[in-house]
Amino acid sequence: MHQVVCATTNPAKIQAILQAFHEIFGEGSCHIASVAVESGVPEQPFGSEETRAGARNRVANARRLLPEADFWVAIEAGIDGDSTFSWVVIENASQRGEARSATLPLPAVILEKVREGEALGPVMSRYTGIDEIGRKEGAIGVFTAGKLTRASVYHQAVILALSPFHNAVYQAL
């Protein structure tokens, strides 16, 4: 059984990670543990590089905390231009897989508040009345009328980031 450490306590992220690992490695093949670790970047990262650095830092911190695991996974959401997106970073003892999620263009009224220094989650909670929206459907769920959720978009990126761990072509010389 694979021991998987999620570098998050966010239910939407944990759900995406659990579902993806079960789809790739088989139902019941993974034990998931979640830990709260620092990202080393601002609460609301801006740009692809800062956001990816946050995910990489979370993986490194989770590895230090639980070094006996088989996989460490982090999902870091950020703002790039006028859109929200995330980076997924997965590591095992010998390799790393990374994938960037789909992007969601944000309305100007939301972007204005985020650029003023507020994190997207609290801004969205205030506009929608949904407490802790970032731990639920997220801006993605709201702006896609529920057709996608934060977890569903993360799930796809986790599947992509897992590709090097189960596909032999990545191991070819």
Curated annotation (Swiss-Prot):
UniProt keyword Metal-binding, yes or no: yes
Origin: domain of life: Bacteria
A GO molecular-function annotation: metal ion binding
Cofactor note text: Binds 1 divalent metal cation per subunit; can use either Mg(2+) or Mn(2+).
UniProt: Mg(2+) binding residues: E38, E68
Regions crossing the membrane: none
SUPFAM superfamilies (alphabetical): ITPase-like
This protein's record includes keyword Magnesium: yes
GO biological process: nucleotide metabolic process; thiamine metabolic process
Catalytically driven reaction(s): XTP + H2O = XDP + phosphate + H(+); ITP + H2O = IDP + phosphate + H(+)
Oligomeric and partner information: Homodimer.
Similarity comment: Belongs to the YjjX NTPase family.
Function in brief: Phosphatase that hydrolyzes non-canonical purine nucleotides such as XTP and ITP to their respective diphosphate derivatives. Probably excludes non-canonical purines from DNA/RNA precursor pool, thus preventing their incorporation into DNA/RNA and avoiding chromosomal lesions.
The protein's name in its UniProt record: Inosine/xanthosine triphosphatase
Source organism (scientific name): Escherichia coli (strain ATCC 8739 / DSM 1576 / NBRC 3972 / NCIMB 8545 / WDCM 00012 / Crooks)
Name of the gene: yjjX
